[in-house]
Amino acid sequence: MLRSVSPPGLTAMTMRDLEEVLESRSRALTAAKWIYGPRAWSSVMPSTVPGVSPQAWERVRATRRVADVRVAETASSADGTIKLLIALDGGAIETVMIPSSARSTICVSSQIGCTRTCKFCATATLGFGRNLLADEIVAQYLIARMLAPEQAPAKNVVFMGMGEPMDNLDEVLIAVEVLTQSPAPQLGHAQVTVSTSGVLPGMRRFLAESRGSLALSLNGSTDAQRTALMPQTKTWPIGDLLDLLRTDRSTHPKRIHFIEYVMFDGVNDTDDDARRVVDLLAGINARVNLIPHNPIATSPLRSATGDRIDGFHQVLVGAGVRCMIRSPRGQDIAAACGQLAHVRTR
């Protein structure tokens, strides 16, 4: 479900949109630098923009609106992660700023709630509210990047917050185009990653229409495992999903494919599972992220032990698979993978 909104949003304007409305390439460049440049967020449409004539800017004011979003709550983790509860029309979402030594990552949401029912994800317990608009997605980045440490600017965006991006693909594709356009925000295509639980038609369209990176939440070495954890994935078998990545690898060799594998104790964490994953990924050259399960109140699932995760990692690396073990970030404020559900931490 997508709201019918008129006029469309200011922070969903591509360079093509700006040139069309402002009737000038140079004015469009100036406006883009200002709209997407580093400044405090405001939901009020500016009356003027430096370097753009009032008459030209009035055409933008007459045809666009500013996303009505505001930060309702901020929570800070001991590891530097910051979670934002962002209020908007029809509900609220969560956005996370994750700092590292050299750059920060902004984790954005694509829906209020989620259309999927993954057993290990807190967002699934919220049900589905609505799809976000492209300007609301981009606004999350513009707001959260201002919280990044000066020595670690926000250079990465991951669509791994609330929602299934492939179920809101029209708006996600616009947001990815805006985030990667020059002169601003000017993120690299490899630095924008869209995650999916495995919606094959959406994946196919995303790979055809975007240069962004794709992350597939695999989370099982067999279809039976995967369906038990993610019931709505039964429509598209693992083999079909990975065949698509294999085909895309042959036509777009520079694109990065990520395989996300959340590890659960006694469910998907054996050496046999690891060997099956190696076989499944043959010919894809994907980067595998092993993710310890972050606990949520509504699920009895437990994370695999550190030793089991290490053993799984060794099997994959020994077979030549590029693989990393991801450390939980923001777990103490319910900001880690699978924990986003408006949980108050204070």
Regions found by a protein language model. Give the residues of each.
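Short acidic/polar mixed-charge low-complexity motifs
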Residues: D89-I93, A102-S104
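Short beta-strand motif preference
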Residues: L84, T95, I106-V108, L216
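Canonical Radical SAM [4Fe-4S] cluster-binding loop centered on the CxxxCxxC motif
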Residues: P99-A139, I143, E150
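Short linear Ser/Thr-Pro motifs
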Residues: T74-S77, S109-S110, S195, S217
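Auxiliary Fe-S-binding modules of radical SAM enzymes
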Residues: M1-G90, P149, R246-I256, Y261-R346
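Conserved AdoMet/S-adenosylmethionine-binding subsite of the radical SAM
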Residues: M146-M324
